[in-house]
Amino acid sequence: MCMTMMSDISQDLLEEILSRVPITSLRAVKSTCKRWKDLLNDPSFSKKYGGKRDNEFLAIMTSGSRASLMSVNLHGPRDNKDLEDPFIKQIGELNQDQIFKVFHCDGLLLCITNEDNTRLVVWNPYLAQTRCIQPIDKFYIYDWYCLGYDKDKNHKILVVYSPMFGRIEYEIYSFLSKSWIVLSFPTDWQISRDECLSLKGNTYFIAYKKMEVEEVGFQEFLLCFDFTNERFGPLLPLPFQCYNQTSLVLSTVQEEQLAVLCKRCDAYETKIWITTKIEPNAVSWSYFLKFDFKVDISGGSFFVDVEEKVAVLFCINREKEKGINNKTYMIGEDGYYKEVDLGESNWCPSMCSYVPSCVQV
């Protein structure tokens, strides 16, 4: 009888096997043998296979104080309408306590907790590494926290203190120097929503001009913080006339483009645009999808699949008499529609795409 040893498995076959291991099981797999650990920690392996599982991608969902790793399949449900498996499902819990917000950048998660306002936690679930960041002063959950990196891939954290506490300040933490600095510069704008995300190392916000605040509302713009120059860029145009009475949500497309969803609060019509060019000082847009959607998406999240021409929305459904349920909706052209109930919750689900990486913290 001939027995094949684990060490006899070809490199290609080993990569194929390990690429299918759930991220929540990686710690146990790495402890099996040195060869597996070295491969899983190889940046080229995580870049090649990270987040790609048979047309699926990974996402982090936070709701209340829980953070979960989700698998989202935008291809199967539309290709086979009789498919019973949901297009989104939980594949694991992330072991950080009392998470209020998660900000994703380059495979790292910046975690803001509910209870402890004396530290931030930077976490790489793929490598099972964490770093606690002590502030100059206390953190507050209603401030803005952003993770990014400069042109040399040096990671940094930006904290924008909320004006509701009587101060508008900016602080930046460098992983390289392990220290904070206070940034000071005049601005003619104000960040208007709890909407910010990372793209190519920089962070994008929604903002308005201070002098344009009126009773009828104010026009909003896109605003970029450049982590290389450690400065905000100019106000950039959105692809529509957007005022504060409008539901507006940002998302990324394959870590290369920015997408924006717009829905007026007094109408069902919902539109999505995708950038054709995105830089700290310039942006251009292309129309992507239009559909009618009755549910309020304020505070929610969404993803798009350009090839399938579909959007996946995550928001609270308040139609039930008892309790509030989180729901996911897949909507496409020609009236395509599918929904999945994610369970009862008093918190709107916040979703961000997640691609494992070997960035050290």
Swiss-Prot record:
CDD domains, A to Z: F-box_AtFBW1-like
Domain of life: Eukaryota
Domain F-box: 3-49
Organism: Arabidopsis thaliana (Mouse-ear cress)
Record-annotated disulphide pairs: none
Record-given protein name: Putative F-box protein At3g19560
